[in-house]
């Protein structure tokens, strides 16, 4: 069976318009269980829009999204959480007046995941939130809010995890640490799609990347190969990444 046939997510000829602007213009790709796929490209290339359509925040205007063999395009976000898709956001939006622990409890209740519930205590320990578990989310620094956003998604036991700029604002030590956590999640069989501008981080964690421009794929393969492509180097990643 080919990797594409084994995919947990398949996006085919996806279109998303905002007025006359085509944010996605025939985008197609797939991801298999246990794979970390990076979506890269300049601002406005369609990376976050793709995540928003896959997660049910936006309905597609054309094309198809298939998750685990069933059409998922246009399905409401909370229903997709039940089916096994969850995500983080560029700017985390926790319930600021609730404690860290309560935020995760709300995510569990909202997600309604089947199977054994993820241990909140384990998540707090694993993602360095144990010491602030009973403090309001408003008290957290930016890195802690990112980790809370991630733990809320993980609490619902997703089979497909979408990470939108998770690394932004993290220091080098934090980046190395979270890279290890993401790779460990993939090792359990979780499929992960990463939208990110930090190419060093993408290189560290991804198995494969899709480079987008104007809502279309212009390259698919490893980042190591991408940085040798003149079009990718000059227009999307910047020439310094070729060295």
Where do the protein language model's features map onto the residues?
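Glycine-rich phosphate-binding loops of nucleotide-dependent enzymes
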Residues: 2-243
């Amino acid at each position: 069976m080919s990797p594409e046939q084994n995919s947990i997510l398949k996006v085919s000829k996806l279109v998303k318009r905002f007025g006359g602007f085509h944010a996605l213009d025939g985008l197609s790709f797939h991801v298999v269980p246990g794979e970390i796929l990076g979506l890269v490209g300049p601002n406005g290339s369609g990376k976050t829009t793709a995540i928003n359509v896959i997660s049910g925040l936006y309905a597609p205007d054309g094309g198809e999204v298939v998750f685990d063999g069933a059409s998922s395009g246009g399905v409401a976000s909370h229903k997709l959480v039940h089916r096994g898709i969850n995500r983080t956001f560029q700017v985390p939006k926790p319930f600021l007046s609730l404690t860290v622990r309560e935020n995760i409890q709300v995510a569990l209740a909202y997600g309604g995941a089947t199977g054994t519930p993820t241990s909140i205590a384990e998540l707090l320990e694993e993602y360095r939130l144990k010491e602030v578990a009973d403090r309001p989310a408003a008290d957290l620094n930016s890195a802690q809010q990112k980790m809370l956003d991630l733990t809320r998604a993980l609490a619902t036991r997703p089979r497909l995890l979408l990470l939108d700029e998770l690394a932004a604002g993290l220091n080098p030590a934090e980046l190395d640490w979270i890279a290890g956590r993401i790779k460990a999640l993939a090792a359990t069989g979780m499929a992960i799609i990463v939208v990110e501008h930090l190419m060093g981080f993408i290189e560290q964690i991804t198995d494969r990347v899709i480079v987008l421009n104007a809502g279309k794929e212009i390259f698919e393969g490893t980042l190591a190969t991408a940085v040798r492509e003149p079009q990718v180097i000059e227009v999307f990643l910047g020439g310094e990444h070729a060295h």
